[in-house]
Amino acid sequence: TMEAATRFKDVDQFYIPWSFDYRGRAYPIPAFLSPQDTDFGKSLIRFVEPAYLTPDSEDWLAFQVATTYGLDKATMQERLDWVKNNSTLIGAVALDPIGNRTEWEEVEEPWQFLAACEEYYHCVMLKDRDHTSLMISTDATCSGLQILAGLARDESTAKLVNVVPSDTPQDAYKVVAMHARPNCPKEYQYFMDRKVLNVQ
């Protein structure tokens, strides 16, 4: 990623070519500097055409800060509240990332958190920018089930995989683990959680 970033650092813009498989899934062709890169690689990506700030876009910047910190299972309101209550932390990380690295290097997605803090600080707190080009990460939840729920118009499955609105993000893997646990040998039940089912 560092080699790719060094190679592109003086380029005004570059394009990311995509490949589609037989299921309709899209994959970026480059291994580095793409929306499916590592945390570090994702943190470097900016859109060429910025979006001008609105109250909604400010909320989405806050969403990115909280999500990359580790609140990906929290409601939108909980994430917004967390950002509001942690503005001192966000400002400290944005202004002095080296001096405050212990505040961010152990979070869920440290590099994206650092990038989000810097963007949020300038766009929302300091207001010295009226636009943002930061990539906001949203992720599909068990995309195969999302497609099937949509095709079958199955509302219960759609809710389970976050196709229909819900205050709290749903977790299909956790629900399957809860239902499978009683049917597994007792010595394995303690270890049954969503991660057991989410193995590739």
Per-region residue spans from a language model:
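Short, positively charged, Gly/Tyr-enriched micro-motifs
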Residues: V196-Q200
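P-loop NTPase catalytic core of nucleic-acid-dependent motor ATPases
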Residues: F191-R194
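Catalytic nucleotidyl-transfer cores of nucleotide-processing enzymes
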Residues: M2-Y188
